[in-house]
A protein has these predicted regions:
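RNA-binding accessory domains that recognize and position tRNA/RNA substrates
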Residues: 3-7, 15-174
Length: 174
């Protein structure tokens, strides 16, 4: 489930009506950006918690295991990019399947977020979990391009931003 803001200037209807807002007639997705320390920017749509976050940008090419990766303490302070094109399709399993009792990444980047999990053991969808844990997440067009950029230019700091400014943060200096 994506986050939305009310667009009172929407030309398709009367956005002062409560029923129009509830029906989604006046909603637009919240946009954010991943900004790398070399100035490269990737724009995307939020599906996590809407707040700025900074860290080292890393990637994982695994096809499954995103709940385990997000709760893995070795990813603490990092913005995790998942390169597999479909993330969220099996939802979030029970806590007993996690690596730790909380999410450790400082942000998540994917290319195709699925908000309707289809696994019998799913307890919630990924976006809901990220919002509950206050972790920002963006769906960008091409995680392969981002991964190639990191591979070519080496380790890179980044930040997920919406409208506010935050400094870059290097978790390796803690």
């Amino acid at each position: 489930m994506q986050q939305y803001v009310i667009d009172r200037n929407f030309s398709g209807g009367d956005c002062s009506r409560h029923d129009a807002i509830l029906a989604g007639e006046c909603l637009k997705p919240v946009q954010g950006s991943l900004l790398l320390e070399d100035g490269t920017m990737f724009e995307g749509t939020s599906f996590g918690y809407e707040r700025a976050s900074a860290g080292e940008v890393v990637f994982s090419t695994g096809m499954v295991g995103y709940p385990e990766s997000l709760t893995d303490p070795s990813f603490a302070g990092q913005i995790l990019t998942l390169t597999y094109p479909i993330i969220g399709n099996y939802g979030i399993p029970d806590r007993s399947m996690w690596e730790d009792d909380k999410i450790h990444v400082s942000g998540l980047i994917v290319s195709n977020y699925i908000d309707t999990p289809s696994h019998v053991q799913s307890s919630m969808n990924l976006g809901t979990w990220l919002r509950e844990e206050k972790i920002p997440a963006l769906e960008i067009k091409d995680t392969r391009l981002l991964t190639k950029h990191i591979r070519t230019h080496g380790t890179m700091l980044g930040k997920i931003v919406f409208d506010e400014y935050i400094p870059f943060y290097d978790p390796n200096n803690d």
